[in-house]
Amino acid sequence: MGENKTGDGGKLLYCSFCGKSQHEVRKLIAGPSVYVCDECVELCNDIIREEIKEISPKRDQDKLPTPHELRAHLDDYVIGQEKAKKVLSVAVYNHYKRLRNAGPKDGVELGKSNILLIGPTGSGKTLLAETLARFLNVPFTMADATTLTEAGYVGEDVENIIQKLLQKCDYDVEKAQRGIVYIDEIDKISRKSDNPSITRDVSGEGVQQALLKLIEGTVAAVPPQGGRKHPQQEFLQVDTSKILFICGGAFAGLEKVIEQRTHTGSGIGFGAQVKGKEEKESMSDILSQVEPEDLVKYGLIPEFIGRLPVVATLAELDEDALIQILSEPKNALTKQYAALFEMENVELEFREDALKAIAQKAMSRKTGARGLRSIVEGILLDTMYDLPSQQGVSKAVVDESVVKGESAPILIYEQTESQAASGDQ
């Protein structure tokens, strides 16, 4: 085949597919008595790409990753939280195994196991859910429980969560029904008191009631393409029993509720057993003893807790874990910034004392891993501002003094030809 813009004897040529002349298109490719224009070639490419997109998820479904494989993938991106990784891997594996073997098995219908993650801010709750969804190649969306209200009140309806999930997969209902929904700040919709109130709690217990059916499994009616609901509109029917819901929250103060129940090292009077400082349990140890009754006392209604049978607790990250997070995962912060500097042909080096100082700063802010990026961004801001305008920089080094704000990153310049000839360093 060869390009042909003029026919034999000056004859005008046309595309054999769309009929456009050689003057209406940029390129006309000639074959044996056949011509095809660049627009038709591009259209054919688009059709092939669409078909590949449709086939690839089906191929991914052929083999469901085992809990060991899921855990290994989480290890690449999430540091620590070993118990939570194991619990999540098994729960996610069982959920998708249930979907693949739909229908009762020997008269036994498999129940749905949604997940509740309990852990402090910046401990990796969102990252765990997001990493699993990416690995399984399923749609994933996040919702903030604090923005949800009961239907009829100002705020987001719970159905909006399904709307967001549909948007992630171009309103493909089948894809959405295999998705994962992460609802953050679930502890913020706890009941305001232990006793049911006569006043309406539209952002607390009311939202829990509204989420019940959605999480357990119902057919949600969602308007197509984000349109507002009105009687003439056809709704998309989404079966939420196939969607995996993961709820997460910090549950500040829950450890006190657990301690009251366990009565370890508490009490008053001469006969009370009081633990010394070295004997006191860490918060993660206390949270790992959580029972449904503790969550009820905290403010979640029993029916809601019943829809989240799998509970995993995450430990607060210590200094060593934060140092690992900075440098070890596949998408570690230091690797991300090194890649940014590499685009300017500059090598970026973080020294060990710098990593330790960054981790200590994050610990003092009590923001967990979430605070690491803002610290690193602040350290490198001036350097990233000046670097594109500077010539000959080959390396930037960050040490402890840079993190403490005592000095700027050390810039190492390339040796020029004239310096090399004169022997200057």
UniProtKB/Swiss-Prot annotation:
One of its GO terms (cellular component) is HslUV protease complex. It comes from the Bacteria. Zn(2+) binds at residues 15, 18, 37, 40. One of its GO terms (biological process) is proteolysis involved in protein catabolic process. InterPro entries: AAA+_ATPase, ATP-dep_Clp_protease_ClpX, ATPase_AAA_core, Clp_ATPase_C, Clp_protease_ATP-bd_su_ClpX, ClpX_bact, P-loop_NTPase, Znf_CppX_C4. CDD domains: RecA-like_ClpX (cd19497). ATP binds at residues 120-127. Keywords: ATP-binding, Chaperone, Metal-binding, Nucleotide-binding, Zinc. GO terms for molecular function: ATP binding; ATP hydrolysis activity; ATP-dependent protein folding chaperone; protein dimerization activity; unfolded protein binding; zinc ion binding. The keyword Cell inner membrane does not apply. The keyword Zinc applies. HAMAP family: ClpX (MF_00175). ATP-dependent specificity component of the Clp protease. It directs the protease to specific substrates. Can perform chaperone functions in the absence of ClpP. Component of the ClpX-ClpP complex. Forms a hexameric ring that, in the presence of ATP, binds to fourteen ClpP subunits assembled into a disk-like structure with a central cavity, resembling the structure of eukaryotic proteasomes. Belongs to the ClpX chaperone family. This is ATP-dependent Clp protease ATP-binding subunit ClpX. It comes from Shewanella amazonensis (strain ATCC BAA-1098 / SB2B). The gene is clpX.
